Every structure is written in C-alpha cells, then in structure tokens.
Amino acid sequence: MIGPLESVLYRDGATMVERHGRRVAANFGARAGEEAACLKAVGIADRSDRTTLDVRGDVDAALLALAAIGERAWSSYAGPERAVVRCEFEDTAACLAALGSASDVTRSYAAIAVVGPNAEALLDAADLPSSAVTLHEAGLSWEILVPPALGPVVWDQLLEAGAPLGVACVGLDAIENLTASKRLRA
C-alpha cells in the first residue's frame, strides 16, 4: 500500500521499502549522515510502519494495563475519554490484548517521527494543525500523527521550520540502528 507520505519522501530522495504492508523510506542516501543528524540536531522520518490504536472510555485504566508492556508502547491523551497508543507492528496483538477495547486506526494517520536534541525546538517552531496528536516516545524521540491528507503538508512545514535547527530527512535504517544502540536517550 502506498503510504500517506510517499510523494514527499520520493521528492526528498528516499529509497523506499515495504514494512508490514506499507511503503516507507529506508534511507535518504547515507545512513551514517542521517544518524549524525539525529544525534546532533534533528531528523524527521516516516513511521507509518507502526501501529496506531484508539482507546476510548476508561482511558486511565486502559493505559495502566498497557504499562505492563513497558517501553514497547507509548501513548498520549487525545481528550478526556480518549487516548492514542503507538507500538511496533509486532507488538500489536499484545497491545490490543492489554487494552481490551482499542481500535486499530493505523490507516487513519500519517505518522512522522521527530528525533534528536532539537526535536522539542522543532515541535515548538512548527505550525502543526489542530488535528495533530503529538506523542513522546522516549528520550529524544517524538511522533506526530495527522490525518493522511495533511501528512505531506506537515512534512514540508517541519522541513521549513527545522531548517535553522539543522533538520534532515531520515530513513528507518538510521532510526532503527539508533534505537537498537540506545543512542537516542536523553
């Protein structure tokens, strides 16, 4: 399936791969340079390969149950009786089991990771739409979820707002290597 960010990813030089039925950027030409950008400034990456779950009702109880999964899932309140949960594709079944009554809404969002020491500054500088949900994954890693039609617009806004901060387009190869090596911890 074509991902919601594919047009801007190709435009910006991505080498595309398929992950869990979605096409995402593996790299933008040089994994080492992409990793360096994430460690020294800020990188943005397509994270449409992950699962997005919608939780409604007794959100506090659901998120408490989800805590048993640990760092494999992260969440954000999206209203008084609603939360959005993100996890790696392979952890989807465990998250759904822990949450009880969550809905898989992965295809309802474009997901953009914002990673690095300048990530918070970029999030502050970007003019994100009111429909955006921002989640703090861990350490220096954040995610922005927006409706698919807004994905390319938000990608471009992040590139523009992030230019003074040293923003770079980053592929999953770099993100996954940094995550595995735990070099993105604050």
Regions found by a protein language model. Name each.
Residues 1-186:
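Basic, glycine/lysine-rich polyanion-binding surfaces/domains
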